[in-house]
């Protein structure tokens, strides 16, 4: 999730993980893309959400957020918000058009903490620097920068150039139907431009049409099948089977406007580098023009590229939090559960399950009851590998891992241990005969048989994006990183690879225990080094040597695990 809690303030932007925001009182939303709304749902009832007027409408349409929690702020105006309960400290915020997707804005914050500019996702244009709030050589203390395309080796064309490339592809295929793969929001101006150029209706589904009506775009869209030459589908619909079916009815080409480094493997699929994020050169121009004192990347690390562009005149100053703001940040936030509306306990529940942990690092679980007020001043924008546990915890207690006798479903709860809290990632994996977890990888992405993503690692990708144990708390990303484990025939028995001292086992478990009870004990006590889990070696090693089954499935005669237990206990 691309969001931040601004340190030394009660402010969060695009961050909806409430356990990380216990001291936050002002929530801001830059735009409506799903990676910036993760954790936000119709049950939100905690604090007002500040956003642009258009994003406010989309919040109501797409997430059904109650109107009383939405606070639209006009773009280009100064807005004053209270930072305490006494009216002593105030915040001035100005919204700037981010040139990214409909309703997307940047936030310029000014207060006791100095001046901070949060870009959210944006595509830089020189006109941004001419808005009144950025004129007169304003000093930016901290710039939170969207560095999605922060790769000096990749050149991206402007959106106008990419649009011309798409138009030329369509001209080169007269009589062909055109299918364009997009996400649910964004690139609407491209569709309007193509409709005007080729004088045709653009066919969309009903859900997208509802969004387009909210955006009040020109009337060039329809839901009537076959009414126009151009049709918009979700990117995941661009598949070999669909292309074959479409071409049986009419000659069809597919176009994917994306900044992701992809190469088409199909003669009728065209990948065009159309991006709503700033190119590296544009980022360099933007940072150079603002010359901020310090820079915080939103997506990953980019300081090696921009350190020379930071202001040489000043050094970051220490922020002194006013006492009234401290009290405001410590006030009970009355955070409620997003599922059943019940008030959550402030104390951390005891975690149960199999802990995958490095032998060198002992798992420590902080308790909210022992935390003092200084916890609210933790810098959430810095990544400290020593502060975050490098393990994933699989909670296989009786309440979270069970077999449904009627459906045969399994539900697995993945929990990530962090320095401040335990973030529960609910991965309700429903298994049936027709779908495995591995088939869920492609949801929302084009068919890999048609295109492949270039083996090109961007400098913006942080270490947290590369390993499951230090990955994003987004449930989809974490679960996909575990696919190599789920795809094997056994999940729970992975814990049996690294065995403890046999003497400690026999002393802790009486010989009279049945093998299944012993197996449960193994799963609750064995550890696997995080580096082995990261490389996916654990399960592959097990499957090469044993025919292992999950504990709640029938065991074959002569199960090697039972034999291993007997050997272990005989030592």
From Swiss-Prot:
CDD domains with a match to the protein in the record: SNM1A-1C-like_MBL-fold
UniProt cross-references to Pfam families, sorted A to Z: DRMBL
Position of sequence motif TBM: 501-532
Functional summary from the UniProt entry: 5'-3' exonuclease that plays a central role in telomere maintenance and protection during S-phase. Participates in the protection of telomeres against non-homologous end-joining (NHEJ)-mediated repair, thereby ensuring that telomeres do not fuse.
Biased composition (Polar residues): 470-487
Gene this protein is translated from: dclre1b
Catalytic activity: a beta-lactam + H2O = a substituted beta-amino acid
Domain notes: The TBM domain mediates interaction with terf2.
UniProt-annotated stretches for the region Disordered: 346-386, 431-487
Enzyme Commission designation: 3.1.-.-, 3.5.2.6
UniProt keywords, alphabetically: Chromosome, DNA damage, DNA repair, Exonuclease, Hydrolase, Nuclease, Nucleus, Telomere
Signal sequence segment: none
A GO cellular-component term linked to this record: chromosome, telomeric region
Protein name in the entry: 5' exonuclease Apollo
Tagged with keyword Hydrolase: yes
